[in-house]
């Protein structure tokens, strides 16, 4: 009887438990997002964000092919490591669809897709076996600018390319040219990080900047024709001329002075709106511009010029967390990836910081291949407290392997002649013997002697003398800033002292022993 009761109780308990409603089992659904990161050695890096996943896999198929299902992506795809998928062995200049899926122990995520187009390597890039070098770099300012003259023609460019000596013989001058500019006057926007009231340049401004230099009939065409015409007169040079192209800054904020302004103002790449609060998107904008320039260069196909590399426009690179406005600049998170991309194609990354600017001692970490220091001594007028030091300049060059920028100006330096009539002409940084503009308040300065011409010529001579004295002549590279038009103004000046100064500078450039190394 007792055994019978135990049996009945057990059956009752079983039925009671079995009839209770079960709690639903919670299944964590895997979710993933992917975005383009970079191209590298014939492949592509894809950035992954995921939740509730054990692993994420990705693969690429030619655009238009059937999309793979989740099982196939896992079987044939590449597994993400450190939130990054690398898919290699891709053809250049080809459109691909990248597919990715996340897995968990119980299910798959939704398959996600990203369209990419691999960069092309042009014939002149394939044939390049090493990085291009040069002894001297001549700055050619321009772009969509409010400065005058706005456009370059063969007459203006000529004195940058060749010079005629005292005996009437013509000689080749600079080896390389930097195409540089900092504004899009048509859009009233700045290509460079600044704290003024200008709007940050967007993708359209970047295009206009590149087109000014590289489009049909642009400065590249004029420079190429100038070299060809000179070669017909004096024979081909012993070197091939180089060009370095300036890259606009990918400025985080639409209005840099307003730290609440938009970070998504710039434009789209691969159909996606870039957000410059993400350094990866700033890198992507740089790469877009590099590819735009390369494509334009290929179309232009200059006969006498090679594209040597790209230049960082900002003259200060805040790359340490304790630097001023670091959270809005973060160059240490941007430039190394840009440098890596350039190096794949044997392009160099260049920079010219102003005196003691942040970043001058971090160029190796930032991936910068060559740097020229600005001494800024040309503007250390006697009436100003002297703050610039040749000792610092050359100690820095010795420590980091930098070169030096030579600095002088022509009529561009005449702004501020309002004090000329009162006998205080200190505002002129023009090297010219005669005033070329009516920038004084009375509009009467033009044609008058420039009382600071001798001082400014001596400042230019100081650059050359100090460079030699420090042992850098024949050892370190030279860059030259000459304002917007000083080379032409000196070379064509009716004043003998101006022409003498021009030839003195030219001899310093062409007699540099580094040219023979």
Report each predicted region and the residues it spans.
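Extracellular fibronectin type III
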Residues: 105-120
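N-terminal catalytic cores of secreted or lumenal carbohydrate-active enzymes
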Residues: 122-288
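Recognizes extended acidic, P/S/T-rich segments that occur
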Residues: 58-91
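Extracellular recognition modules
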Residues: 97-101
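Substrate-binding cleft of secreted/luminal carbohydrate-active enzymes
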Residues: 356, 372-383, 389-517
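Eukaryote-skewed repeat-based solenoidal scaffolds used as protein-protein interaction platforms
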Residues: 247-248, 254, 277-403
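Bacterial Sec-dependent N-terminal signal peptides
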Residues: 2-5, 15-37, 119-120
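Surface-exposed loops/turns
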Residues: 41, 92-93
């Amino acid at each position: 009887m007792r055994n019978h009761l135990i049996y009945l109780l057990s059956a009752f308990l079983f039925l009671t438990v079995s009839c209770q409603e079960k709690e639903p089992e919670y299944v964590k659904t895997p979710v993933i997002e992917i975005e383009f990161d970079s191209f590298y050695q014939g492949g592509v890096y894809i950035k992954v964000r995921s939740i509730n996943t054990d692993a994420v896999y990705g693969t690429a198929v030619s655009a238009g092919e059937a999309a793979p299902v989740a099982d196939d992506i896992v079987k044939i795809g590449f597994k993400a490591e450190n939130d990054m998928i690398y898919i290699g062995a891709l053809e250049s200049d080809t459109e691909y669809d990248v597919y990715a899926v996340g897995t968990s122990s119980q299910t798959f995520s939704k398959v996600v897709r990203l369209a990419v187009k691999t960069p092309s390597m042009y014939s002149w890039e394939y044939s390049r076996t090493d990085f291009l070098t040069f002894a001297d770099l001549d700055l050619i300012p321009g772009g969509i600018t409010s400065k005058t003259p706005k456009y370059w023609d063969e007459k203006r460019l000529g004195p940058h390319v060749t010079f005629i000596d005292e005996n009437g013989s013509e000689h080749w001058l600079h080896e390389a040219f930097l195409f540089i500019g900092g504004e899009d006057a048509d859009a009233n926007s700045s290509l460079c990080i600044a704290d003024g009231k200008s709007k940050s340049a967007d993708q359209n401004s970047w295009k206009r900047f590149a087109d000014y230099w590289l489009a049909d009939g642009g400065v590249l065409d004029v420079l190429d024709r100038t070299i060809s015409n000179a070669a017909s007169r004096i024979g081909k040079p012993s070197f091939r001329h180089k060009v370095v192209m300036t890259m606009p800054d990918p400025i985080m904020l639409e209005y840099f002075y307003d730290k609440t302004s938009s970070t998504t103002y710039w434009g789209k790449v691969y159909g996606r709106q870039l957000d410059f609060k993400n350094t990866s998107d700033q890198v992507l904008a740089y790469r877009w511009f590099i590819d735009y320039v390369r494509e334009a260069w290929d179309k232009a196909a200059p006969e006498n010029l090679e594209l040597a590399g790209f230049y960082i426009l900002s003259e200060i690179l805040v790359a340490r967390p304790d630097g001023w406005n670091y959270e809005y600049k973060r160059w240490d998170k941007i430039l190394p990836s840009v440098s890596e991309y350039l190096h794949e194609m044997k392009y160099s990354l260049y920079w010219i910081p102003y005196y003691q600017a942040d970043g001058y001692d971090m160029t190796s970490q930032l991936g910068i291949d060559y740097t020229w220091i600005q001494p800024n001594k040309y503007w250390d007028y006697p009436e100003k407290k002297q703050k610039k030091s040749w000792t610092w300049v050359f100690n820095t060059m010795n420590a980091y392997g930098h070169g030096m920028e030579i600095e002088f100006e022509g009529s561009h330096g005449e702004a501020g002649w309002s004090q000329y009539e009162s006998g205080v002409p200190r505002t002129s940084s023009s090297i010219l013997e005669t005033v070329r503009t009516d920038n004084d308040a009375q509009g009467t300065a033009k044609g008058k002697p420039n009382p600071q011409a001798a001082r400014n010529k001596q400042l230019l001579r100081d650059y050359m003398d100090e460079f030699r004295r420090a042992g850098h002549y024949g050892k370190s590279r030279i860059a030259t800033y000459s304002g917007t038009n000083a080379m032409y103004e000196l070379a064509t000046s009716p004043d003998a002292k101006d022409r003498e100064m021009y030839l003195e500078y030219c001899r310093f450039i062409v007699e540099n022993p580094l040219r023979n190394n």
